[in-house]
Amino acid sequence: MLDILREPDDIRIECEADNVDCTVITEIRDERLYVYVTAAASRPRFICLRWNTRFTEPTRIMGDKWERSYGDMEWHSLNGEIFMPWYFLANSADTTVGCGVMTGAGSFVSFQCDASGCTAWFDVRCGGVGVRLDGRRLLAGIVVCCRYEGISAFEAARRFCRVMCERPRLPEKPVYGSNNWYYAYGKSSRPEVIRDAALTAALAGENENRPFTVIDDGWSVNPCAGPWKPNERFGDMAEIAAEYKKLGVRPGIWIRPLHDVVLEKEHPAWCLSRINDGDQNSTPTRCLDPTVPEVREYISATIRKMTAWGYELIKHDYTTYDLFGAFGCALNGKITIKDGWSFHDETKTSAEIVSELYRLIREAAGEAIIIACNAVSHLSAGIFEVYRTGDDTSSRHWSRTRAYGVNTLAFRLCQNDAFYKIDADCVGLLPGKISWSLNRQWLVLLAESGSPLFISVHPEALNEEIKAALTQAFSRNAVQTDAAEPLDWLYNNQPQAWLVNGQKREYDFVEEYYPALLSGSTQNY
């Protein structure tokens, strides 16, 4: 079976021009392989490490993602064209091997496995060009490799995630509650979010650990685009937070920290040199460059403003898309598709810049809980308490919830409590849309997964049966002591057989709702 905790058989260096002085040093100590890169004149782009080995037994492979997953996680055959960010697992019979890098790496690291061995690519670029190290010694990543025998592949994945992250930042109390996006989709108002808070408080009953009610996109003057000031439908956001607390919920709020259309027009020099092209649902946009000192001050002040308003949870979104110009589903190996652009500070790698941004947000938020959405997973671990692991579920299209929700819960639940608390996204309830039979199963599985449960409920979708089920789910999830494990995930990427607290559970996530053709858009809710 594969073992990469040894000196690589080959090392290759790709620089912006001819390699003049870039060197790579690997050191093995304490059962880890340290990868260092040094250059004075050369500007390295990629470092390639290769371990040659023949796979002699039938082997299945499962890797992680740069940011969220998009219904695309699964165990697959050896395929050298699939590049797996951060880590992967190889399973053969009762043996599972985990290969990856420690969280907080200094570069974007991806792996590939083929029949003749394994390759690790260290993307040390600054944006789309080689980084200017100026003689600095960069720790590009720390490689780890563990072999597990006699335990399930899921348990092996869970243990390996704990190896990769030594100090996760976890909330003092379990996080759960409601979010208005999945029924309002950005069209909301102060009276409606107050109603949401009252409903959430009622569903939580006498739970000592009170739920959050998160105001998602739609509260600011320009939806999804800043500046982060309330529109006339919401008014004073501090008053809303205070009302939430009176009702018995903890206030949460959504923000896109790297996009402010007013600031970008006033200070074009503060923007990234690259314009995001957008997709069929979004227009091309400029975004702020977090290596510009004034931008860092702006981001910090914006986050501090929200905590001063009284919000105890901040959900930040779009940092991967805004920084690199694509959603994770469009990326394979390289974190950014476009070449020829860089951040204002060319002396740091993209990974270092992302980590600095996340630490800035963390520091500005103080004691507030952070949910990171469309964020870089391996660079969020140890900094943020909660991490959205999959693209949006839906209150309208069950195929989307099944593909994006069930899949990400199964394949990233191993990260729960190891990197952060995983957020597999909401149970969305709209009248006349997804059948309660299906949504009920999704609700129960989430509530008993040991990971955060969020619901998004239009009041007209409720009846007494649904209210009772939501109350029971909140009661269960308020403590999050359950343990769940997918049993059929080696051959089913939307697992229906689960082990919950040692008891086997069978779900039917299809019923009469056969998989439908999705539009291909990441925003088709």
Feature-to-residue mapping (PLM):
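Short helix/loop capping segments that flank catalytic or ligand/cofactor-binding pockets
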Residues: 186-187, 223, 456-458
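Active-site-proximal substrate-binding groove within the catalytic cores of carbohydrate-active enzymes
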Residues: 123-125, 134-140, 179, 346-525
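Glycine-rich, acidic and aromatic/proline-enriched surface loops and short helix-turn segments
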Residues: 199, 206, 220, 260, ...
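Short strand-loop junctions, especially beta-strand C-caps/beta-turns
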Residues: 181-183, 218, 432
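Short, acidic/polar
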Residues: 189-203, 293-307, 439-440
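Carbohydrate-recognition beta-sandwich/jelly-roll modules
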Residues: 1-211, 313
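Hydrophobic, Leu/Ile/Phe/Ala-enriched alpha-helical segments that form helix-helix packing faces
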Residues: 37-41, 87-93, 197-204, 244-245, ...
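Aromatic- and carboxylate-enriched substrate-binding clefts and catalytic-loop regions
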Residues: 74-76, 87, 209-429, 466
